[in-house]
Amino acid sequence: MQQPCVIVGSKYCSPNPVGLAIVRKVMKITDGNFVITSADGKLLFKVKDPLFSLHGKRILLDCSGAKVLTLRGKMMTMHDRWQVFRGGSTEEGALLYTVKRSSMIQLAPKLEVFLANNVEEKICDFKVKGAWLDDSCVVYAGDSDTIIAHMCGKQTMRGFFFGKDHFSVTVDKNVDYAFIASLIVILVEIEKAGFITKMTTQMIIGF
């Protein structure tokens, strides 16, 4: 991308492509922690799950522990809609963007991203295609075929819930990599919530 794509902050944009290494270590069946580093191992972000939150909330911290973003999904809609706020606030004025599943009948989530000023949400500002468990996902600018980031890795169902997953993300030059990191985290959370809902429904029907 030629023009800088600044969503979270200009300091997260580089004139060269940025490689991110992401590790997700599962602590419990319902939550996990992410560690995000540069390709050469420098710590960039951590993602923490606050205890006893009334919403599905995740906090993106920088290497110093400062709050960069708050990711919030309502408990009844965590499988299809999340809001992302600047810093540690969840006030309306701190809203940066909303991420939602474009269709509830999709086997693999296709996500649409709407910036805070896109209140009508008719045309998305970004979109994400692919799935964590499919080992690949791609982030596009707007409703176009322009790729601004892509993820690859090797996940297993066991690792998804009980182990440790490693994967890499390549972010295009001039693209906000804090923004991209948050989209990958939300993609995983949406997949996880949808899978748990599906399994719970099957168990109830089975009984």
UniProtKB/Swiss-Prot annotation:
General function of this protein: Involved in basal defense against virulent oomycetes. Might be related to the phospholipid scramblase and tubby-like superfamily of membrane tethered transcription factors.
Species annotation: Arabidopsis thaliana (Mouse-ear cress)
Organism lineage: Eukaryota, Viridiplantae, Streptophyta, Embryophyta, Tracheophyta
PANTHER family attached to this UniProt entry: PROTEIN LURP-ONE-RELATED 1-RELATED (PTHR31087:SF160), PTHR31087
UniProt xrefs under InterPro entries: LOR, LOR_sf, Tubby-like_C
Tissue occurrence: Limited to discrete pathogen infection sites in leaves.
Record family assignment: Belongs to the LOR family.
Record's protein name: Protein LURP1
GO biological process: defense response to fungus; response to salicylic acid
Induction profile: Up-regulated upon infection by oomycetes, but not by bacterial or fungal pathogens.
Null mutant phenotype: No visible phenotype. Reduced basal and R-protein-mediated disease resistances.
Cellular component terms per the entry's GO annotation: mitochondrion
